[in-house]
Each structure stands twice: as structure tokens, then as C-alpha cells.
Regions:
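Positively charged n-region of N-terminal signal peptides that target proteins for export
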Residues: 1-4
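Bacterial N-terminal signal peptides
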Residues: 6-15
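Exposed acidic/polar residues on beta-strands and adjacent loops within beta-sheet cores, strongest
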Residues: 20-191
Length: 191
């Protein structure tokens, strides 16, 4: 019975792990818009523990009142501040949502970053769920203007240690404000 339980858990988690490692090719192809002007935060895939257990363990009481945190939470994610910092300018806010985290420490291991404009969801900075120490994980995110932001992503090869990606790229996004939508417009290698 115990072996069966282990196999079921492994089979459930394996597709998510493989997907998170192999879908980062979006950084290697010409940029294409993945966010749509639906205003709906994409639903979270199940993590390694329930949303309520992860919320109790890693949730932030300072994120309970914002409209963005409410929308992220309602979609099954646990809201968090990326690098423990508020990322906001004018009415643009970037908020993290996780479905798994390290224990102890609560470092997100399955997450995405959600962009809100005037409290309305505009899109995610990555078309896939990201994981720490994996190719395509987000680093610094900056709101550079009322209609623009940038995000840096680590690029790992199979020979890189988790601490040390081979390179970094920066994606620049335009925010279409009428029906808030996040659109990637440029990708540049930084190193």
C-alpha cells in the first residue's frame, strides 16, 4: 500500500516537474503574446500541499486586503511578494502566486508573477509556471513606466549549478491599458 501511495504521488508530481523544466523554450523563440484581455487570473495547478496548508505556512498577512491578492488567491495560488518587495508604480502592481515552497523558508518553488493594472489582471510575466534554480526563472522585475515593465530571467544549461545560471535575459513588456493586457515586445541577452 505504501509503495502504491508513493507511485501515485510521484506520477502526480512528475508531469509538473518535467513541464516546468522543458517548457522554457519560449525564451528561445520569437516572442508571442500569451496573455489575453480576459481579466481572469489563470488557475493554479496543484502543488505539493493544499492551498490552505501552504497559505498557513507561507502566507503573508499584509497581502490579505488588496484586490490583486484576492484575485490570485481565488485562482488557487498563494500570494507572495517577489523577493519580499512590493513591485508597483502608479496603478501597475506585480504580485507573485505560488503553489509550492521550500520548508523551512517558504521560498517559492512553483510560481508565476501576475501583473495588475488599476486592480484588473493584465497577464503573467511567463507563459509557464516557474521554479527556483530552473531555466527561465524570474529575477528582477521593474515597472519602468505606466505602460511598460521589464523582467529578467535566468538561463541555465544542464551543466550549471542551481546558484549560477550561464546567462540572463531581459524581456520588455508593453501594457495595453484599454483592456489591460501584458504584451512581451523585446528580449535581450544581458550576459
Amino acid at each position: 500500500m505504501r509503495t502504491l501511495l508513493i507511485l501515485v504521488v510521484a506520477a502526480t508530481l512528475l508531469p509538473t516537474t518535467v513541464s516546468a523544466q522543458s517548457d522554457t523554450s519560449w525564451l528561445d523563440r520569437p516572442l508571442a503574446a500569451w496573455s489575453q484581455a480576459s481579466g481572469t487570473v489563470p488557475p493554479a495547478r496543484a502543488g505539493t500541499e493544499s492551498q490552505s496548508a501552504l497559505e498557513r505556512r507561507c502566507g503573508s498577512s499584509s497581502l490579505t486586503a488588496s484586490a490583486a491578492a484576492h484575485a490570485v488567491r481565488n485562482a488557487g495560488w498563494v500570494p507572495f511578494l517577489h523577493f519580499d518587495r512590493v513591485i508597483a508604480r502608479d496603478d501597475v502592481e506585480v504580485l507573485g502566486g505560488m503553489t509550492a515552497a521550500t520548508s523551512p523558508g517558504c521560498e517559492p518553488t512553483m510560481f508565476n508573477l501576475f501583473v495588475f493594472v488599476g486592480g484588473r489582471f493584465a497577464g503573467t510575466i511567463s507563459p509557464i509556471v516557474m521554479g527556483q534554480g530552473r531555466d527561465g526563472v524570474a529575477g528582477a522585475v521593474r515597472v519602468t513606466a505606466a505602460d511598460a515593465l521589464t523582467a529578467e530571467f535566468a538561463r541555465y544549461t544542464t551543466k550549471d549549478a542551481e546558484c549560477c545560471p550561464s546567462s540572463r535575459v531581459r524581456v520588455t513588456y508593453r501594457i495595453e491599458r484599454a483592456q489591460p493586457t501584458l504584451v512581451p515586445i523585446d528580449l535581450r541577452t544581458l550576459r
